[in-house]
Structures are given as C-alpha cells and as structure tokens.
Amino acid sequence: LLSAQLADFQGGELLVDLYCGAGTIGLTMAHRVGQLVGVEIVPDAVENAKANAKRCGIENARFLCADAKQAAVQLAQEGLRPDVVVVDPPRKGCDPQVLEAIAKMSPQKLVYISCNSATLARDCKQAAGAAGLPPKNSGSGGPLPENHPCRMCCTAAA
C-alpha cells in the first residue's frame, strides 16, 4: 500500500487508525509497528476488523467502536502519544475537532487517505497549522471496484 510506504515506519511505532472500517489499512501496517489502535463507528466493521486481525495472526491490534471525533478527543485527553496517525475519512473529510485532537496527540506523522482532493487539501492545511505537520509526500492509487476513480494519500511529518 502506498500509505504504508509513505509512512516510512522504523518499527515499534504506536499507530492510531481513525475511520478504520474493517481494519484493512491499519492491518496492512500492523507488522511494521509495535501497536495498532483502530477506531470505527460501525459495529459490524469493528467486528470484521477484529476477525481480520485474528485471521491474519495479528496480535498487536485493538479496535474501538466509537465515533472518530469522540475517540480522538478521548485518546488525546488520556495522553495517548501515537507516533503515526492514519485517517481515511468519508468524502466530507475530518471533523475539525478530530484534527485538533490529532494535534494534541502530537504524532510525528499523519497519513491522510482520501478520494476527495478538496477535503484532503483543506484538512492537510489545518493539520499543518494545528499540529505543525507540513505535508511531505503525496501520491495516488488506482481505482477501487465500483468506487471513486482514485485514492490520494498525503503524509505530513514533523
């Protein structure tokens, strides 16, 4: 995955995957990090993420069934300090409070995946200002079946 390549993991990182769905993106990175925390609001998707982790023999992942905004704010208040945060929000982009919570968590890297270039640009700009994470790399991937024509990925790093 392009997102894993752009994240440039060194090994042992704490990765938070917001809007994780069935865990596909985070689980592809789990073998490169120390711990994965996935957050998704859809209960069936969270159960699928847990099943996918088990099926793949991944033991360093946990998944929370929660709204991304509420979870991000709570994780920031708890003092969680992830090395990398991955977001793959809906087309409307991230809620501003999600980006503020990410800034409070002070990650070294933010990997933003989107099918909407306008919200990707808007949110990466806000992340750059709030968290001091200027965009470093970007790329795009091929089409997904019966989905948008391409996925874009932007990495912001301190």
Regions found by a protein language model. Give the residues of each.
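Rossmann-like S-adenosyl-L-methionine
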Residues: 1-158
